[in-house]
Amino acid sequence: MSDSRLVDPFGRRITYLRLSVTDRCDFRCTYCMSEDMQFLPRDQVLSLEELYAVADAFIGLGVRRIRITGGEPLVRKGITGLLARLGQRAELEDLAITTNGSQLRERAAELKAAGVRRLNVSLDSLQRERFAAFTRSDRLEQVLDGIQAAREAGFERIKLNCVVQKGRNDDEILDLVEYALANQLDISFIEEMPLGSITSHRRELTLCTSDEVRAIIERRWPLTPSLARSGGPSRYYQIGDEPSRIGFISPHSNNFCGDCNRVRVTAEGKLVLCLGHEGALDLRELLRSHPGDRERLSAALVAALNLKPERHHFDAQEQVQVLRFMSMTGG
């Protein structure tokens, strides 16, 4: 049993923090942000010291896993120093990063040295033109080189995250699994979440459910349920005795809220209790009004958990329910 003091009204203990360190990104993925995205003024983004104060308070309350997100976290100046401070915290069982992979070729080794244990790398296509269309950036080879650099650096696990969309990349599902198997990587296939208003595609038409993805994979390989858990919402399967795990994140077709053990803090200091709800608590105001007051911050976090909803209600057929883009929330 976790000793976390962060307990919501439904008895779920929060042991996992997803901490966004920037809303900025060197890609413009079509499902994550609009092409003309306006980033936050820098003074509205938490400083590195404020980010550490937030993480420190959560650790003190029983959080044992932290994932650093963005935007693209590796474009944040000074991020390695923050990671090194967190990497020294003996209480943490896991320190991970979600990245687009664009910076990994040069920085994988320093991330490993800082104490990062696991990487998630977004990869929606292995085809150059299609990758460029998804990301609005022609840097597929740079990302693939970065993944290889991360393998050489020796992370505990590296996982690919793929958002599958009908008519856009669902014909690459088997190719992506083959790439993961060949490189001993995990891969999670994700149903697109309806966050932020976009014009590049109609989500209700491109939604590809996890069951559909799984059926495609099982035409070639039988999938066996895995006992492995990552602390996140993925349901994992394995192919024979391959070390790679095949995961499915299914916010639409298989609601995973019952086991929710996580909260998010955005780059501007908003505590997001549920990905599918607009409500958030402003931690930045508290941090700047009472700098260094860990007790006050901790009390606010404990109290905020009373507002955590039981579940989200994502519906691909309805209008956008959350106007906040994924790049603002932290992936």
Swiss-Prot record:
Residues 9-234 form the Radical SAM core domain. [4Fe-4S] cluster 1 binds at C25, C29, C32. GO terms for biological process: Mo-molybdopterin cofactor biosynthetic process. Its EC number is 4.1.99.22. Pathway: Cofactor biosynthesis; molybdopterin biosynthesis. S-adenosyl-L-methionine binds at Y31, G71, S122, M193. It catalyses: GTP + AH2 + S-adenosyl-L-methionine = (8S)-3',8-cyclo-7,8-dihydroguanosine 5'-triphosphate + 5'-deoxyadenosine + L-methionine + A + H(+). SUPFAM superfamilies: Radical SAM enzymes. InterPro entries: Aldolase_TIM, Elp3/MiaA/NifB-like_rSAM, MoaA, MoaA_NifB_PqqE_Fe-S-bd_CS, MoaA_twitch, MoCo_biosynth_MoaA/MoaC, rSAM. Its cofactor is [4Fe-4S] cluster. Keywords: 4Fe-4S, GTP-binding, Iron, Iron-sulfur, Lyase, Metal-binding, Molybdenum cofactor biosynthesis, Nucleotide-binding, S-adenosyl-L-methionine. Binds 2 [4Fe-4S] clusters. Binds 1 [4Fe-4S] cluster coordinated with 3 cysteines and an exchangeable S-adenosyl-L-methionine and 1 [4Fe-4S] cluster coordinated with 3 cysteines and the GTP-derived substrate. [4Fe-4S] cluster 2 binds at C257, C260, C274. GTP binds at R18, R67, T98, K159, R262, V263, R264. GO terms for molecular function: 4 iron, 4 sulfur cluster binding; cyclic pyranopterin monophosphate synthase activity; GTP 3',8'-cyclase activity; GTP binding; metal ion binding; S-adenosyl-L-methionine binding. Belongs to the radical SAM superfamily. MoaA family. Monomer and homodimer. Catalyzes the cyclization of GTP to (8S)-3',8-cyclo-7,8-dihydroguanosine 5'-triphosphate. This is GTP 3',8-cyclase 2. The gene is moaA2.
